[in-house]
Amino acid sequence: MFSFWIRKRIFSLITFLLKPIIKFEIEFEDGVSDELIKEAETVYAVPTNSVTDLVALQLLTESLNIFRPLSKISNSNLNRFTCLKAPVFSQKHQKIMRQASYNLESIIELDDSHVSIIPTSFYWGKHPDKQKSLFKILFSQSWSATSPIKKLFKIIFHGRSLVIQFHKPLAIDELKDKGKNTKDNANLISRYLRALFRRSKQAKLGPDISHRRTLVLSLSQNTEVKKEIKRLSQGNAKIKKRLKKKALKYANEICSDLNYPIVRLLIRSFTWFWNKRYDGIHLKNLEEIKKISSENSIVYVPCHRSHIDYCALSYILYENGLMVPQIPAGNNLNLPIMGKILRGGGAIFMRRSFNNSLYSTIFFQHIRNLISRGSSIEFFPEGGRSRSGLSLPSKPGLISMIIRSFASLESVNVKIVPIYIGYEKILEGQSYLSELSGKSKKGESLLDPLRVLKDFNNYLGNAYINFGSPIDLADFLREEVKKLDLKENELNEKPEWLRKATTSLGESIIQGINSSVAVTTTSLFSISLLTDSTQSLNEDKLKQRINLYLNLIKNSKTYDHVWLTNTDASEIINKTVGLKLIKSQLVGNSKIFKPTDDETSILSFYKNNISHIFILYSTVCESLRYVNEISYDEVVRLVRLVFPFLKRDYNLLETDSELDELIKSALKTLIKSGLIEETETGNLIKPNSNTTKYEDFIALSNICEPSIKRFFIVLNTLWEHPSIQREELKKLCTKIAKKLETIEGWPYPEFSDKNKFDQFIDKLLLDKLVKEDEDLNLQAARITKRVKKDYLNFFNQQFINHINEMN
């Protein structure tokens, strides 16, 4: 009795001393509230035997006027809390053993079947935006063990930024196994609580990688790695020993060393950057990701436009209490000092080539381990940055690894989250200029981030992150390959279905990114100005064009979830001018916008960010452009002819099964907007050539015209050369396209991009419209010549003459 009195008085004294220091916020999981706690027969479960956590809980319950943890359960002498205890080394058994959770066995033995356990988590220092002190950052929450001194500093520095989270109640009667005794049931419930607290902490902080040395060692000694070493050594002991050393070296090179003090220091610098150089980062649809984060391993797959994409997503996830992802990065960044900082921020360094089978096995096993532990991963599916502003085709490497890892694991939930990251002005604008002007692309360089420093002091406007609809990997594979079992001994093999599934998932990811695009002020300005045939508009006409494109977006059946960040035409123009992307000219009393060559090149980047939204509208208009009158059925037929290639070119969402309905909807919108007119007989015609509507009609047609012309260049070259090597075909097509750029004045360098020709040739081969013989020569199938006449509907005679002259 005296001992109990002493403990109670000590607890009261500690509570009195800590009360002025501790300030908390409360988080309730869905379905939990203070009213529910009041009404139920409640017992709190806390994750550690911590007096400070218990004091904080006592203060919180007093403020909410609900059951206190030290109050008694009805009709008993038991406190309303249980806590898990850290394992200890047993001298008797000579091993580390779990300790019984405080009070739990006694609670289980109660006759009251209505007692519920409410797991309660504590997060000290979860507001990095409010942390100005280096000490606050160093003593904030992490997975590493906490000494009494560090715990004291944690309370001093983070007592006023504590988050207490109440999880869903657990009915003891439902958790108990009636066939087991009290002790076994206590162990069972303790295991369940440990797993719950671990998942919750992992969702906030990321996986526990506080023992990196152990992780590196276990990765290098993984079963599959051992098998690969055995295969490569072929029984030679010396080779086997050398390969083991290499495996350890590779594992050490690959593994991140996620360090939360480093993360918080980086976050602090990012906060300054986003608030000083940009007007902050604006978010959409993050709540959906929060809901699924605790029960799923999340793979974030954002588009890649800028070097700062890396810090943008990690910053936002951390700021919103989500796990910091592990990010595969090129090992060219693994330099002294910088490499350690990046590794501490979650970087997984990887080589550009996976030709080394031992290295490939180790890297794959690491990705598999991350997924099995519920880690978040972030990578850019396009590979490198898009200098044109268009979405690039996905690279198969990491996507394939994610699929193989998931297929070989049981009871793991994986969600792939496409993300659009957009900027009103990218930091690399000037450094991209040469490539946007049509010069060949330079490779990635370590100095690239330093080259953008000259733009660092400029005002950069707003940044946007829009989270797309998550792709459930189990559902995707079930639909795609109809089977999910991949045996352990086949992990290093690639099943027949993998390539198709990888391609399909890659396409779904890029389409998911495109469907989540943030339509920025600069993108709307750029597409409105650059699609005009003269590329010169006065302010009033430019406003009218912007409003037209806004209306088309709002009426789109496919892209109805894109983010319109600004819908005021005047503000859109003023913002673009304010960002110094273009200067206006005063001609008489009119303000004219006519970009210079450099301005056109930069603006084309922003135009390309949203071009895909208008492709269906544009193709419908293009089918009418060079004919006097056309039937509805003929429009559908012509659009269907070219749309499969446009779909691949722009990573479009429209499916073949819904295309007819979407064309009908697009026609309805275009007719309502006055860009297409109906005759008395029900046929379709373009507007009168002397009207503003005709200018808008032509501007909209201009969006898809370069792509259709590029398709025709390839087909016509194949018709002129019955058997030709792929590289020679690309060379001839690029040469023709460059000449046409000069003749027709195309300002878009992607018109003659070799990669675009590559994509079209791939699609022709896939659809068996082009055949490849034993000597790798390409030959056009006969069916392609039948569509030649149809393709001519999309061009004027002048273009056809130019093509004939060049072949």
Identify the function of each model-found stretch.
Residues 1-807:
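Membrane-interfacial terminal anchoring regions of lipid-handling membrane enzymes
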